[in-house]
Amino acid sequence: MRKVAIYGKGGIGKSTTTQNTVAGLATMDRKVMVVGCDPKADSTRLLLGGLAQKSVLDTLREEGEDVELEDIRKPGFGESWCVESGGPEPGVGCAGRGIITSINMLENLGAYEEGENLDYVFYDVLGDVVCGGFAMPIRDGKAEEIYIVCSGEMMAMYAANNICKGIMKYAESGGVRLGGLICNSRNVDNEKEMIEELAKKLGTQMIYFVPRDNDVQRAEINRKTVIEWDDTVPQADAYRGLAEAIDKNEMFVVPTPLEIEELEQLLLDYGLMEA
């Protein structure tokens, strides 16, 4: 079983990318569980046909400790399994703790056991804040390979670099490695070349360039992943391509984060910042 975490700055399209990738893997007959680690609890909605799933923390608050696996894990598109860790009430407590509680509960209830025949577990993690709780999947060895969703926008690249600092810190003590950058295009000038160069400087690869396409929004309005909505459109091919690239990936590295000056120089070189 491959344990994958998807990180990236808020609003970059992590949840959309994760769910569409999982749909792509499902069409390749891979058995996948998705664990949403974002307090917004929107990491599985498209796989569940638009249903808002009750989160692990909400279930615990309402039912107490007496929880069965089927209470927190729902079947989604392509025989995937869907879990949302959820978060605390706004203004109270730490969302990172919710991730820790959820993953421990899934382990105790046997969600990862061999009889489940999982090929992958995907953690979709809020990524601007590399605080201890959100870093938990990489810190405690729950995730072994990380993909960072980014774009050619400055803040997305800053966030990617910061996440690499977190990976580097925990790679020394555990087995976590960076599998690559996924460029979720924002149609920025020179975007593909810039992310390829950023990946090179980080010691990794741009594993896939996902073009920007309104079919993603059309599918979301229909509460589906692109592949489930219309598997003949070019964007469905893009997500299948990304799923295949992850499935075949063999490049796992400890990243070499950039100093802020190097990152700014990269942005200057590609015309995103004025000298």
Swiss-Prot record:
Enzyme's top EC category: oxidoreductase
Cofactor binding annotation: Binds 1 [4Fe-4S] cluster per dimer.
GO biological process: nitrogen fixation
Keyword annotations: 4Fe-4S, ADP-ribosylation, ATP-binding, Iron, Iron-sulfur, Metal-binding, Nitrogen fixation, Nucleotide-binding, Oxidoreductase
EC number annotated for this UniProt entry: 1.18.6.1
Swiss-Prot/TrEMBL catalytic activity: N2 + 8 reduced [2Fe-2S]-[ferredoxin] + 16 ATP + 16 H2O = H2 + 8 oxidized [2Fe-2S]-[ferredoxin] + 2 NH4(+) + 16 ADP + 16 phosphate + 6 H(+)
InterPro entries: NifH/chlL_CS (IPR030655), NifH/frxC (IPR000392), Nitrogenase_Fe_NifH (IPR005977), P-loop_NTPase (IPR027417)
ADP-ribosylarginine modifications at: R97
Obligatory cofactor(s): [4Fe-4S] cluster
Signal peptide: none
GO molecular function: 4 iron, 4 sulfur cluster binding; ATP binding; metal ion binding; nitrogenase activity
Chain residues that bind ATP: G8, K9, G10, G11, I12, G13, K14, S15
Post-translational events: The reversible ADP-ribosylation of Arg-97 inactivates the nitrogenase reductase and regulates nitrogenase activity.
Binding site for [4Fe-4S] cluster: C94, C131
Superkingdom to which the source organism belongs: Bacteria
Disulphide bonds in the chain: none
Subunit: Homodimer.
Role: The key enzymatic reactions in nitrogen fixation are catalyzed by the nitrogenase complex, which has 2 components: the iron protein and the molybdenum-iron protein.
PANTHER family listed in its UniProt record: LIGHT-INDEPENDENT PROTOCHLOROPHYLLIDE REDUCTASE IRON-SULFUR ATP-BINDING PROTEIN
Family membership noted in the UniProt record: Belongs to the NifH/BchL/ChlL family.
Name the record gives this protein: Nitrogenase iron protein
The organism of origin for this protein: Maridesulfovibrio salexigens (strain ATCC 14822 / DSM 2638 / NCIMB 8403 / VKM B-1763) (Desulfovibrio salexigens)
